[in-house]
Amino acid sequence: MKIYLVGGAVRDSLLNLPIKDKDFMVVGATPEQMQQLGYRQVGKDFPVFLHPKTQQEYALARTERKVGLGYGGFSCYASPDVTLEQDLLRRDLTINAIAQDEAGNLYDPYHGIADINARQLRHVSAAFAEDPLRVLRVARFAARFHDLGFEIAAETMALMQHMSQTEELTALTPERVWQEVDKSLGGPHPEVFFEVLRQCGALNILFPEIEALFGVPQPEKWHPEIDTGLHTMLVLAQASSLTEEKAVRFAALVHDLGKALSPKEHWPKHHGHGQKGLPVIKSLCERLRIPNEYRDLALLVSDQHQNVHQAFELRSETIIKLFDKADFWRKPERLEQLLLACIADMRGRTGFEHHAYPQGDYLSACFSAASSVDVKAIIAAGFQGAQIKQALNSKRIEVVEQVKLNWQQSQTKQTP
């Protein structure tokens, strides 16, 4: 019986990255032997055990055979006669197929160390094509290790393109697709994840709403990058540099889905695209079972980002209506999230990457003033029932109007 550290822990150690989780593989043992040593079995489909003290996972060496569609269509064979090389052969990428024994010796039968040094994401064997989830995993690794210079090997990209032309991707469950997307949204370069999916042809299958944005033009005056799909990737990249909140990043990704619905004869204009995108976002979120937190913010950003961009032109009444509709009174954090997404939208344009966004400061000042209106004072003044709400609304409009005047005066003073 031999124990090896495998997978991400070995890879990240070689890359001098912090190690989050450790996975171990056991060669030459039976489930009964593991249980006699105090390990507790938790795997249903194949033998995985928890260490009696550390609770880390130890899996018996195994091979896999394709028996059906999807990432779950495998039959596993675990036995003491399965070798280290056989187990590593079933893994996705060579950089994930390196093992380390208890003495610290490395075992690298598929040249993963060479690929780490060459910064290549390369599949271990042709069996890679049997698991459609690996298309998403490779896209996620490309995004995760983008700053380290990793690229997808040409033969691996060709295999991913072939896989995207089969029915395998459609067999993925919504939960597994979203799990990979969510992990990517939490990484440093989620835009690379979607760019890779587009490059291999998977974006059109898994996210046709996003694929539809590519090739849709925008006015060059406001969008030097012109293409809506490219703009969307730039916005997602900007959102990722502004915040680690995955809900904001998702909202940035889907804020312009309505532009794909604009009639071609109206191009490059997209009147009402924010509202047109709402049912598209709802459908996408329902299909992939995306959390309500993400969906609600995405709907808000799509619906209101044009208003936020035009904040200085809005009447005070309209600003209060925006605050009411978004329910900022009960959820003030959503204002900051909305503004972050709008800053990303503004900066996600070629040549605008470092521009200021005074609309954000202005709306924050408006909300701060409106929030300071004292309801108790209104009640003390004798207002009752529906009159309280009306008086509160009027007072909020009044204080926002004052903010508006102050802002205009400050801008006038700054103008030479």
From Swiss-Prot:
<feature type="binding site">
    <location>
        <position position="11"/>
    </location>
    <ligand>
        <name>ATP</name>
    </ligand>
</feature>
<comment type="subunit">
    <text>Monomer. Can also form homodimers and oligomers.</text>
</comment>
<feature type="binding site">
    <location>
        <position position="8"/>
    </location>
    <ligand>
        <name>ATP</name>
    </ligand>
</feature>
<keyword id="KW-0511">Multifunctional enzyme</keyword>
<keyword id="KW-0692">RNA repair</keyword>
<feature type="binding site">
    <location>
        <position position="91"/>
    </location>
    <ligand>
        <name>ATP</name>
    </ligand>
</feature>
<dbReference type="InterPro" id="IPR002646">
    <property type="entry name" value="PolA_pol_head_dom"/>
</dbReference>
<dbReference type="GO" id="GO:0004112">
    <property type="term" value="F:cyclic-nucleotide phosphodiesterase activity"/>
</dbReference>
<dbReference type="Pfam" id="PF12627">
    <property type="entry name" value="PolyA_pol_RNAbd"/>
</dbReference>
<dbReference type="InterPro" id="IPR012006">
    <property type="entry name" value="CCA_bact"/>
</dbReference>
<dbReference type="GO" id="GO:0004810">
    <property type="term" value="F:CCA tRNA nucleotidyltransferase activity"/>
</dbReference>
<keyword id="KW-0548">Nucleotidyltransferase</keyword>
<feature type="binding site">
    <location>
        <position position="23"/>
    </location>
    <ligand>
        <name>Mg(2+)</name>
    </ligand>
</feature>
<dbReference type="GO" id="GO:0000049">
    <property type="term" value="F:tRNA binding"/>
</dbReference>
<feature type="binding site">
    <location>
        <position position="21"/>
    </location>
    <ligand>
        <name>Mg(2+)</name>
    </ligand>
</feature>
<comment type="similarity">
    <text>Belongs to the tRNA nucleotidyltransferase/poly(A) polymerase family. Bacterial CCA-adding enzyme type 1 subfamily.</text>
</comment>
<keyword id="KW-0067">ATP-binding</keyword>
<keyword id="KW-0533">Nickel</keyword>
<feature type="binding site">
    <location>
        <position position="140"/>
    </location>
    <ligand>
        <name>ATP</name>
    </ligand>
</feature>
<dbReference type="GO" id="GO:0042245">
    <property type="term" value="P:RNA repair"/>
</dbReference>
<dbReference type="Pfam" id="PF01966">
    <property type="entry name" value="HD"/>
</dbReference>
<dbReference type="InterPro" id="IPR003607">
    <property type="entry name" value="HD/PDEase_dom"/>
</dbReference>
<keyword id="KW-0819">tRNA processing</keyword>
<keyword id="KW-0808">Transferase</keyword>
<keyword id="KW-0460">Magnesium</keyword>
<feature type="binding site">
    <location>
        <position position="137"/>
    </location>
    <ligand>
        <name>ATP</name>
    </ligand>
</feature>
<keyword id="KW-0694">RNA-binding</keyword>
<keyword id="KW-0547">Nucleotide-binding</keyword>
<comment type="function">
    <text>Catalyzes the addition and repair of the essential 3'-terminal CCA sequence in tRNAs without using a nucleic acid template. Adds these three nucleotides in the order of C, C, and A to the tRNA nucleotide-73, using CTP and ATP as substrates and producing inorganic pyrophosphate. tRNA 3'-terminal CCA addition is required both for tRNA processing and repair. Also involved in tRNA surveillance by mediating tandem CCA addition to generate a CCACCA at the 3' terminus of unstable tRNAs. While stable tRNAs receive only 3'-terminal CCA, unstable tRNAs are marked with CCACCA and rapidly degraded.</text>
</comment>
<dbReference type="Pfam" id="PF01743">
    <property type="entry name" value="PolyA_pol"/>
</dbReference>
<feature type="binding site">
    <location>
        <position position="11"/>
    </location>
    <ligand>
        <name>CTP</name>
    </ligand>
</feature>
<feature type="binding site">
    <location>
        <position position="137"/>
    </location>
    <ligand>
        <name>CTP</name>
    </ligand>
</feature>
<dbReference type="InterPro" id="IPR032828">
    <property type="entry name" value="PolyA_RNA-bd"/>
</dbReference>
<feature type="binding site">
    <location>
        <position position="91"/>
    </location>
    <ligand>
        <name>CTP</name>
    </ligand>
</feature>
<protein>
    <recommendedName>
        <fullName>Multifunctional CCA protein</fullName>
        <ecNumber>2.7.7.72</ecNumber>
        <ecNumber>3.1.3.-</ecNumber>
        <ecNumber>3.1.4.-</ecNumber>
    </recommendedName>
</protein>
<dbReference type="InterPro" id="IPR043519">
    <property type="entry name" value="NT_sf"/>
</dbReference>
<dbReference type="GO" id="GO:0000287">
    <property type="term" value="F:magnesium ion binding"/>
</dbReference>
<feature type="domain" description="HD">
    <location>
        <begin position="228"/>
        <end position="329"/>
    </location>
</feature>
<dbReference type="GO" id="GO:0005524">
    <property type="term" value="F:ATP binding"/>
</dbReference>
<dbReference type="InterPro" id="IPR050124">
    <property type="entry name" value="tRNA_CCA-adding_enzyme"/>
</dbReference>
<dbReference type="InterPro" id="IPR006674">
    <property type="entry name" value="HD_domain"/>
</dbReference>
<feature type="binding site">
    <location>
        <position position="140"/>
    </location>
    <ligand>
        <name>CTP</name>
    </ligand>
</feature>
